[in-house]
Design a protein with these regions (language model features):
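Catalytic domains that recognize anionic headgroups
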Residues: 3-605
Length: 605
């Protein structure tokens, strides 16, 4: 019987001898290379251009390799005290990495390559060092007490972290663009029968076009069939909420998280959804602005289900960067200082990413940090050379370009410049942009699709140029609310976007309209022009029944405080514009303010 007991117990002892080294090694490397990166990812999902699942195989492989090497080293130690101490110390390191990454998180600032002011964090360094020394000393000198709990302690720590990461993932914002890939082959493919094109020139303020028109009346001739809506308002002071307003007609008011608003509005009676349902081929550009857009195969024609790409160079680069950040997060301050240089070199390269291909790069200098990116010039050259009439169904295109957004990139002759962001310099770039636009019109004409196209050339918002003294030839007195002073809108020029619209088959020199319109009217204008029924809010810009004092809504916030990785916007203040939008006298606050996630409050009560 004794022999039988020996036979049955030896394998158990053998498994126990391997179990603890494997468990503590796996716990340590999973903590640093999988769970810490997972917490970073799901705490900042809006910053990562791919799914965590695409990086997880590489993270897991690195953790597995490290676990094999470390557990092999522990197993190779002599039995008894040496192995006992080794297991205890590794378990202590795993515990410390977990504590550091979850409880000893100090605010060192944004990891964007800027130096960290360690001197102001000396107390944090002292706390880190004290805790690490205390735990490691306990693991080293109290190994006989730590070793018996190392196996189950490691298992428990793995389970706790896996559960915590899963919970964080379930609560994190979903970056919809990570789920899809995009077919760019139809970027400039048009229909011979019918096209709807919205061309957004970022920040192109309406009065700049008025000045271009005053100086060169010939613009009205080559903009054949267009109507210039001078009395237009935007909805917001920056791009993010303006794109949904243009494509859905709906205003974001902080009632729900911004990404939830974008997804729900695009999926319910948005212009892309309506046209896709009507058998239009729907294409978006530029996906650099993805936080303000939503697309899936039911809304956009160039969206494809994504094939995971964990093995490509892009995934390897992001996975390695995430592992470095996970290690940085898991180390005490002394270790962080050693890694600071590597982190400073790595994080800027991850800040702007071309993971979705050329079409996601902004029409400006952000791409790869290149301050001389050609932007709109490259777009129009590509459009001129690549456009074709190959679409068998009606086509809808949304192109969002750099316009006159800061920094300014070229002059009126399309030569690259580095100049201050002033009104005069912006006007020079505007002249160059309209040279490009003329070529765009000529291309559509040569393709024999100009007459068959509904074209909108608009801005998403204005800016705060000073002085703001637009030169108006004449303003209907019904569009004034008081006085006869020159038009001045120094406080509200952000809400004055360019709006040019050419209906299908419209001809003749460009005309000027002072009808009270808004960017939120674009969906209804398009569907009305196409003879389609739509649930979009707003009015058709060509409706002759628009009242001269029609109120239009504008929501203002401090754009400098807006971060698209945040769930909500800064507080929004509501205005109503009831007369000609270029006059301060036409702008009135309603007293309503929209705070993040709260019902609106009325400050006038």
């Amino acid at each position: 019987m004794q022999g039988t007991r020996d036979v049955t117990t030896k394998p158990t002892v053998r498994r126990s001898a391997f179990a603890a080294p494997i468990a503590v090694s796996a716990c340590f490397f999973l903590t640093v290379l999988v769970f810490a990166p997972g917490q970073i990812y799901y705490g900042n999902t809006m910053d990562f251009p791919m799914l965590f699942a695409e990086m997880l195989p590489l993270l897991t492989a690195a953790a597995l390799l490290g676990s094999i090497l470390l557990s092999g080293t522990l197993i190779s130690l002599p039995r008894g005290r040496p192995r006992e101490v080794g297991i205890s110390v590794v378990f202590g390191l795993a515990l410390l990495a977990w504590l550091q990454g979850n409880f000893l998180l100090w605010q060192y600032g944004l990891l964007n390559g800027s130096p960290i002011d360690w001197a102001s964090h000396w107390t944090h360094g002292l706390i880190d060092a004290s805790i690490w020394c205390l735990v490691l000393a306990g693991a080293l000198f109290g190994s006989r007490y730590v070793n018996p709990i190392a196996f189950w302690g490691s298992v428990a720590l793995i389970v706790v972290q896996a559960s915590g990461t899963a919970l964080l993932a379930s609560r994190s914002s979903d970056r919809w663009i990570n789920h899809y890939s995009f077919d760019q082959s139809t970027r400039f493919s048009f229909s011979r029968d019918r096209n709807v094109v919205i061309l957004v020139l970022d920040t192109f303020q309406s009065d700049l076009f008025q000045e271009l028109l005053d100086e060169d009346p010939g613009i009205a001739d080559w903009l054949s069939g267009f109507t210039y809506f001078r009395n237009a308002t935007g909805g917001f002071p920056s791009t993010a909420p303006s794109i949904p307003l243009i494509l859905t007609g709906r205003y974001y008011d902080n009632a729900v998280p911004f990404q939830d608003f974008v997804k729900s509005t695009f999926k319910s009676a948005s212009l892309p959804q309506t046209l896709k349902a009507a058998n239009y081929h729907v294409y978006y550009n530029n996906l650099y602005y993805w936080p303000s857009l939503y697309a899936d195969p039911s809304i956009a024609s160039h969206v494809l289900e994504k094939t995971p790409r964990w093995h490509d160079a892009q995934s390897r680069r992001w996975a390695s960067g995430l592992m470095l950040l996970g290690l940085f997060r898991s180390l005490p301050q002394a270790g962080k200082r050693v890694l600071e240089g590597a982190v400073a070199r790595t994080t800027p390269s991850l800040a702007w990413d071309d993971a979705y291909g050329e079409e996601t790069l902004p029409m400006g200098p952000h791409a790869r940090g290149d301050a001389r990116a050609e932007g709109d010039i490259a777009f129009f050259r590509a459009m001129t050379s690549l456009s074709s009439v190959a679409m068998r169904t009606p086509a809808f295109k949304y192109y969002h370009l750099w316009g006159i957004h800061a920094p300014l990139l070229h002059d009126e002759n399309l030569r690259p410049v580095t100049v201050p962001y002033t009104r005069e310099n912006a006007k020079r770039q505007a002249k160059g942009t309209f040279r490009l636009l003329k070529g765009y019109i000529e291309t559509l004409t040569k393709l024999n699709i100009y007459d068959q196209s509904l074209l909108l050339i608009v801005a998403d918002h204005g800016t705060e140029f000073q002085p703001f003294r637009p030169r108006l030839v004449e303003v209907d007195t019904r569009l004034r609310t008081g006085g006869s002073a020159p038009p001045v809108s120094t406080r509200n020029s952000f809400g004055l976007p360019l709006v040019l619209v050419k209906p299908i088959a419209a001809t003749g020199a460009m005309r000027v309209s002072d009808a009270p319109v808004s960017l939120g009217d674009i969906p209804r204008t398009v569907t009305s022009a196409l003879g389609m029924k739509s649930a979009s809010p707003g009015e058709s810009m060509f409706d002759p029944g628009l009242r001269p004092n029609r109120p239009r809504r504008v929501l203002k916030y401090n754009a400098e405080h807006l971060h698209l990785t945040s769930r909500y916007f800064p507080p929004l203040t509501e205005y109503v514009v009831s007369a000609f939008s270029w006059f301060d006298e036409s702008w009135q606050t309603t007293g309503r303010k929209f705070l993040p996630g709260q019902p609106p409050i009325n400050l006038q009560r």
